[in-house]
Amino acid sequence: MTNIYEELEQLVAKAGAGAAVDRLIRELEERRDYTGYFYALVLAKRLELGLPAVQSRFDSHVPAELAEPYEQGIREAARRAGRLALAAQDVGAAWPFFRMIQEPMEVAQVLEKLEPQEPEQCQQLVQIALYEGAHPRRGFQWVLQHYGICNAITTFAQGFPGTQEDRIQCLKLLVRALYDELKARLISDMAQREGVVPPAASSVSELLRGREQSLFADDFAHVDTSHLSSVVQFAYYLPVCEELRLAVELCEYGRHLNSRLQYPGDPPFEQTYHDYLIYFRTLLGAEVEAGLEHFRQKAEQADPAQVGYYPAVVYVGLLERLGRHREAVEAYSRYLALCDPQQLGNCPSIYELCDRLGDYRPLVDIAQRRGSLVDYTAGLIQQMKAKPCRAKAANPVD
């Protein structure tokens, strides 16, 4: 019986290179040798383009006119090798090919439907999905399901690859997980105390109402208070969404804890649950003016030499998130004009604020106070360019 090596040698001699490579590709596909299959497809592309079959490690020169089709051939070879592995549910083998060409979507679609069966498989899938960025939300979901909230909090705090939207999606999962845990434990506690199981649809706020003294007797907490504090602080980065409303309820719960269990935060969130509750409610449109005044006073009273600029950063960011661009620019000019932009965190810079406002005069004024001639000149130029646009907007042609 002819072995594959003899068969390939005969094909090269009698049928030519193309026939031999076609046979090679079929053989490697049957063996599910994904790496070999990929390189065989690349070899086929090299022959198609008239390039040498053997590529020296140090001589990878490809003529300029062939560079694009050769690159496309490599990308298609990676897709085919990756898809072959995905067809066998071998995500670990498929992912390097899709990662190489920066096309995670097909792997993400498979990960969305997968459920780890063994601890080792779970670890591998979390590594690919979360830490290597194939599908961060799904990977974080597995961390919550298989390793628990404590590990999920640590993972979120340490960071992982992905977009800002990926982090927001993971944060939403984290808030919901803690909320659901708290709600389940409240229901269980109340069922034992009262002999009646509260409706499953009850919210945390509804479960607390009228039971504050009994539920929090003896310095009791229904969830790990470090988990509660961490998740509430993370929720600062949420947009207006349902999970932000859940964070409000987490704050309401936290406010009832014994003071020993309420860990103080950094300004302007010294009273963690009280201050974050005001912040979240303001974002959600509840008692907005009172909420803004709360944080304005904290920015006004903060001594940058003692506590830094964070109270002002929070206040300016809150104004901007509420769409109050003019007030945000004015607050920035008052409190952050001399702040190092590197300390702004997620607060918009004066450049961004002026751009959204369509008025660059505040940038000019701040640049002069900072002694920045470049920003001063750039602001003047941009202000001059913005004037015709504003005039045209104010007097549209019929």
Q: What are these model-derived regions, one by one?
A:
Residues M1-R99, M105-E106, L111-D398:
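Long, low-complexity, acidic Ser/Pro- and Gly-enriched intrinsically disordered regions
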